[in-house]
Amino acid sequence: DVNGGWSCATTVDAKFRPNGCTD
């Protein structure tokens, strides 16, 4: 994903992956 698959919970990815990273 956008963040390379890490720290999604504390990045913009949290808006799209509220359950955490999957990729």
Curated annotation (Swiss-Prot):
It comes from the Bacteria. The keyword Transit peptide does not apply. One of its GO terms (biological process) is cell adhesion. Its main location: other. Disulfide bonds join 8-21. One of its GO terms (cellular component) is pilus. Keywords: Disulfide bond, Fimbrium. The keyword Plastid does not apply. InterPro entries: Pilin, Pilin-like. It is found in: Fimbrium. The pili are polar flexible filaments of about 5.4 nanometers diameter and 2.5 micrometers average length; they consist of only a single polypeptide chain arranged in a helical configuration of five subunits per turn in the assembled pilus. Belongs to the N-Me-Phe pilin family. This is Fimbrial protein. It comes from Pseudomonas aeruginosa.
